[in-house]
UniProtKB/Swiss-Prot annotation:
Example of a GO MF term: 5S rRNA binding
SUPFAM superfamilies for this protein: Ribosomal protein L25-like
BP term (GO), one: translation
UniProt superkingdom: Bacteria
Subunit structure of this chain's protein: Part of the 50S ribosomal subunit; part of the 5S rRNA/L5/L18/L25 subcomplex. Contacts the 5S rRNA. Binds to the 5S rRNA independently of L5 and L18.
Family membership: Belongs to the bacterial ribosomal protein bL25 family. CTC subfamily.
Keyword DNA-binding: no
Pfam families: Ribosomal_L25p, Ribosomal_TL5_C
One GO cellular component, as annotated: cytosolic large ribosomal subunit
Keywords per UniProt: Ribonucleoprotein, Ribosomal protein, RNA-binding, rRNA-binding
Organism field: Burkholderia vietnamiensis (strain G4 / LMG 22486)
CDD domains documented for this protein: Ribosomal_L25_TL5_CTC (cd00495)
Protein name in the entry: Large ribosomal subunit protein bL25
Gene3D superfamilies: Ribosomal protein L25, beta domain (2.170.120.20), Ribosomal Protein L25, Chain P (2.40.240.10)
């Protein structure tokens, strides 16, 4: 995904306010051997890009003054109550070095699972992203979590996620193995089932 930015000449709080009034958003690019670079971006284009999941979890081609560099979106600052992006941070990536970043989870097949079909359970998504490490070329836009076999009362953990070749959970996630989804039967559903039972003679 391509992002066009411009080198920022004006600095300071007053300058940032003037840029926002002109429909621009401030940002910074850091990392690698190059010095941090202050940039500005078109706010409306950035606002729409931020609505796309891939913009948050993909290697982006950031073009500044005709020169392109590969980056990851690392931070976004929003106005507390206006639909306004105040600032963005991008980190340069090295094609030969592994990176750590969070990848979105896409949950599939809950509706055909034993938990839902047999027990009328509710499958909850405990987290919507997981942190992985990989080379930039191996970074997936998302990871799929197959819920087709989950049963009532069961949970799926981070290590249950099928990872593509070259992608691994970061060390602390691998060690903690957190829950990513769980299936629970609502109390009302249990009561309904109990009421439907035939009393013993």
């Amino acid at each position: 995904m391509k992002v066009v930015a411009f080198e920022r000449q004006q600095q300071g709080t007053g300058a940032s306010r003037r840029l926002r009034n002109a429909g621009k958003t401030t940002g910074i690019v850091y990392g690698g051997e190059a010095a941090p670079q202050k940039i500005e971006l078109d706010h409306n284009a950035l606002w729409h890009a931020l609505k796309k999941e891939a913009f948050h979890a993909s290697i982006l081609d950031l073009e500044i003054a005709g020169q392109s560099q590969q980056v990851l979106l690392r931070d976004v600052q929003y106005h507390p109550f206006k639909q306004l992006v105040l600032h963005v941070d991008f980190q340069r990536v090295d094609a030969k070095k592994k990176l750590h970043t969070k990848v979105p989870l896409h949950f599939l097949n809950a509706e055909v699972s034993p938990a839902v079909k047999l027990s009328s359970a509710i499958v909850s998504h405990v987290t919507t992203e997981i942190e992985v490490e990989c080379l930039p070329s191996a970074l997936p836009e998302f990871l799929e979590v197959d819920l087709s076999k989950i049963e009532a009362g069961q949970s799926l953990h981070a290590k249950d996620i099928a990872l593509p070749n070259g992608v691994a959970l970061v060390a602390h996630v691998d060690a903690e193995n957190p829950v990513v989804a769980s299936a629970t039967v609502p109390a009302g559903a249990v009561s309904d089932a109990a009421e439907g039972e035939t009393p013993a003679a």
